């Protein structure tokens, strides 16, 4: 059995297309849309094409003059097309936040603002194949039910065809929507269209409902809320008005009723303005606005001068190491001249002038801190003008001193500023070498007691007495704090010292302080030992007592870079 479809009347009927577009629009907007679609989907164009579908009868269940029931196999490969228009959300962050709970998602401001873009989609090249249960009745219309998913493929053309991933996403999303449409909404659309064609009662009832909607839309706009005066009107100055004054103003054509504002609304506007200047918890929410409390000008001025007590003070710090090494003949001390170069290697502490200041607002002071505990409570005097240190008591804490005869006359005005380059000078010997020096002094002292009668200058003897008070050859040299002293006349013994950045070390040997001859002899031996070490270093042919020391310290050391402010 075969059927002939008269497809041309459907193509020629303009009313049929209009009604079909309205039904498709309602069906597309009925189901929940994806969050990327932010507007209604509107069918702007519908064309069934010139090629009808193919039907193959599989089973006929009921056949009469006014009714028919059967199972068909339908296939369609025609030229029908459908055009849709809508608006989509182009900001993915906005789409993400819409689909997440507000308490579990961040709340950005302008970054989550919506950006809608109009979208036009054209669906064409439909490929349909499936089993259809068709029931026809003149009183009940046509009922079509698909037993399986009839949609095989279709072509989706949109505004974003140039963007590959957007095109693929739209293709996938629209195919899913159309599969649900064919299974759920299309049978209802076909049933309503059949009732409109064959059932006159349904056609009359539908026309009456359409006329009622048209009359309601043509009745005009609703009542203007601004045309009636407010409940508590006020004038431009904020004074309340009684009803009689409002009536007189309303009768006057020179004054408009819209100029009268409610007193409550003015209070709300004032509260809205004041809420921006306070820390109120009931600040009304405004889109894309961050609320921040205002501070007075006095607070702003004071905040510029305040400094956090935990904020560190950034200042240039340098590690200092001695560069000129010599054994002083009259003081028996090992001295070092300042040279801002390599790391300290364990013979002292770092000098941080900006770290020990009492206040950030005061002028920075440069001091040297003594980290050793004094053995007894003694008097330590120092002169801050020319870095002159002195000592009166033989049992006082050790101080840094040296003889000016073995150092250059260059003044170091700014000990914090590093030198331009490294200096190839002598360095401090290791602890092992200092022990050997002390042992050599003791050996020479036992064998040459006759040389203790040599005369020494008074200043050298005084310096030697101070240096020999603490016999600790293995002690690590440390800096001592310089206390300001204005009384120079009270200093009996003075010795010119290095700048504050230099570090000196004084190796000593155990001495019997009660024997002055022994002290004189020790000072003589120390000077002789220092002279021999200098000669051995200068003369390459001679035998050197400390070959490892001279080899290790003859290499040039590269200074570290200076710290920036």
Swiss-Prot record:
Subcellular location as annotated: Mitochondrion outer membrane
Biased amino acid composition, Basic and acidic residues: 368-378
Main localization of the protein described in the UniProt heading: mitochondrion
Domain SMP-LTD: 1-208
Biased composition (Low complexity): 382-391
Domain of life: Eukaryota
Biased composition (Basic residues): 353-367
Biological process, per Gene Ontology: mitochondrial genome maintenance; mitochondrion-endoplasmic reticulum membrane tethering; phospholipid transport
Function, as annotated: Component of the ERMES/MDM complex, which serves as a molecular tether to connect the endoplasmic reticulum (ER) and mitochondria. Components of this complex are involved in the control of mitochondrial shape and protein biogenesis, and function in nonvesicular lipid trafficking between the ER and mitochondria. Mdm34 is required for the interaction of the ER-resident membrane protein mmm1 and the outer mitochondrial membrane-resident beta-barrel protein mdm10.
Name of the protein described by the UniProt record: Mitochondrial distribution and morphology protein 34
């Amino acid at each position: 059995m075969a059927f002939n479809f008269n497809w041309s009347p459907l193509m020629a009927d303009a009313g049929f297309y209009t009604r079909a577009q309205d039904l498709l629009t309602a069906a597309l907007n009925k189901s929940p849309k994806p969050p990327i679609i932010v507007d209604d989907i509107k069918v702007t164009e519908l064309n069934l094409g010139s090629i009808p579908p193919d039907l193959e009868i599989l089973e006929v269940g009921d056949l009469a003059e006014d009714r028919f029931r059967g199972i068909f196999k339908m296939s369609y490969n025609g030229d029908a097309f459908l055009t849709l228009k809508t608006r989509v959300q182009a900001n993915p962050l906005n789409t993400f936040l819409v689909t997440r709970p507000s308490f579990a998602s961040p709340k950005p401001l302008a970054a989550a603002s919506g950006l809608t873009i109009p979208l036009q989609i054209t669906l064409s090249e439909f490929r349909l194949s499936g089993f259809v249960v068709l029931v026809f009745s003149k009183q009940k219309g046509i009922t079509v039910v698909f037993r399986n998913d009839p949609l095989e493929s279709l072509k989706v053309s949109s505004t974003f065809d140039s963007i590959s991933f957007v095109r693929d996403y739209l293709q996938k999303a629209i195919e899913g929507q159309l599969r649900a449409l064919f299974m759920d909404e299309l049978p209802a659309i076909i049933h309503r269209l059949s009732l409109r064609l064959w059932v006159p009662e349904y056609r009359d009832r539908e026309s009456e409902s359409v006329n009622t909607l048209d009359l309601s839309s043509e009745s005009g706009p609703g009542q203007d809320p601004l045309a009636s005066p407010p409940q508590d009107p006020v004038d431009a100055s904020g004074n309340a008005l009684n009803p009689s004054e409002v009536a007189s103003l309303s009768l006057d054509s020179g004054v408009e009723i819209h100029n009268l504002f409610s007193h409550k609304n003015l209070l709300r506007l004032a509260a809205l303005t004041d809420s921006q200047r306070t820390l109120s918890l009931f600040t009304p929410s405004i889109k894309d606005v961050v609320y921040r409390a205002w501070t007075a000008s006095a607070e702003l001025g004071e905040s510029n001068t305040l400094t956090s007590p935990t904020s560190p003070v950034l200042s240039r710090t340098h590690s200092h190491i001695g560069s000129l090494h010599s054994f002083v003949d009259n003081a028996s001390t090992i001295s070092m001249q300042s040279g801002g170069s390599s790391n300290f290697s364990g013979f002292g502490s770092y000098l941080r002038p900006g770290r020990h200041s009492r206040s950030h607002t005061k002028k920075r002071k440069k001091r040297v801190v003594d980290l050793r505990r004094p053995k007894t409570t003694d008097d330590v005097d120092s002169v801050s003008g020319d870095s002159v240190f002195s000592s009166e008591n033989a049992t006082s804490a050790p101080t840094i001193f040296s003889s000016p005869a073995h150092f250059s006359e260059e003044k170091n005005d700014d000990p914090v500023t590093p030198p331009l380059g490294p200096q190839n000078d002598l360095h401090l010997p290791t602890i092992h070498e200092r022990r050997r020096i002390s042992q050599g002094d003791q050996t020479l002292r036992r064998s040459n007691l006759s040389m203790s009668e040599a005369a020494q200058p008074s200043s050298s003897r005084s310096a030697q007495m101070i240096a020999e008070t603490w016999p600790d050859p293995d002690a690590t040299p440390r800096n001592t704090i310089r206390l300001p002293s204005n009384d120079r006349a009270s200093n009996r013994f003075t010795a010119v010292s290095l700048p504050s950045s230099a570090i000196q070390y004084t190796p000593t040997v155990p001495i019997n302080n009660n024997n002055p001859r022994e002290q004189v002899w020790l000072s003589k031996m120390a000077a002789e030992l220092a002279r021999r070490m200098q000669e051995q270093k200068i003369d390459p042919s001679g035998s050197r007592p400390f070959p490892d020391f001279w080899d290790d310290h003859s290499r040039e050391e590269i200074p570290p870079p200076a710290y920036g402010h």
